């Protein structure tokens, strides 16, 4: 019976081209970005507090009458501001 040839085993080496690129380290976020997401969260909180404390009830000021007419949409608006600010914190370095 003929003998099969033994193949030479090559050592596996990673070529420089096939390596996955490393992430470039980014510096800290700018001041305007931090103030933006903190501001959005605070606007949402203030919106919710003003609606709960001042715009509901028979003694609501006439200046906040438009807010009382929005009704439950005030919760959606306030939470939209807060969630947008929260989502921006995920981009913070």
Swiss-Prot record:
Give TM segment ranges.
31-51, 70-90
Q: Which residues lie on this side of the membrane: Cytoplasmic?
A: 1-30, 91-93
Q: Where in the cell is it found?
A: Cell membrane
Entry membrane topology: Multi-pass membrane protein
Q: Name one GO cellular component term.
A: plasma membrane
InterPro entries found in the cross-reference section: CrgA
Pfam family example for this protein?
Answer: CrgA
- Lyase among keywords: no
- The question of whether Transmembrane helix is a record keyword is answered with yes
Q: Which residues lie on this side of the membrane: Extracellular?
A: 52-69
Which key words tag this protein in UniProt?
Cell cycle, Cell division, Cell membrane, Cell shape, Membrane, Transmembrane, Transmembrane helix
Which domain of life does the UniProt lineage start with? Bacteria
Q: What are its GO biological-process terms? A: cell division; regulation of cell shape
This chain's function reads:
Involved in cell division. Plays an important role in septal peptidoglycan synthesis and cell shape morphogenesis. May facilitate the recruitment of the peptidoglycan synthesis machinery to poles and septal zones and coordinate peptidoglycan synthesis at these sites.
* NCBIfam families for the chain: PRK00159.1 (NF001194)
Q: How does it assemble?
A: Interacts with multiple cell division proteins such as FtsZ, PbpB (PBP3, FtsI), FtsQ, PBPA and CwsA.
Membership in a protein family: Belongs to the CrgA family.
UniProt name for this protein: Cell division protein CrgA
Q: Which source organism? A: Mycobacterium tuberculosis (strain ATCC 25618 / H37Rv)
According to the entry, what is the taxonomic lineage of the organism? Bacteria, Bacillati, Actinomycetota, Actinomycetes, Mycobacteriales
The gene from which this protein is expressed is crgA
């Amino acid at each position: 019976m003929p003998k099969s040839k033994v193949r030479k085993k090559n050592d596996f080496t990673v070529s420089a081209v096939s390596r996955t690129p490393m992430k470039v380290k980014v510096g800290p976020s700018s001041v305007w970005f931090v103030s933006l997401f903190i501001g959005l969260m605070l606007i949402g909180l203030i919106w919710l507090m003003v609606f709960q404390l001042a715009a509901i009830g028979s003694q609501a000021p006439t200046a906040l009458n438009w807010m009382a007419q929005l009704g439950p949409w005030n919760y959606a608006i306030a939470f939209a501001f807060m969630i947008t600010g929260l989502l921006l914190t995920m981009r913070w370095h």
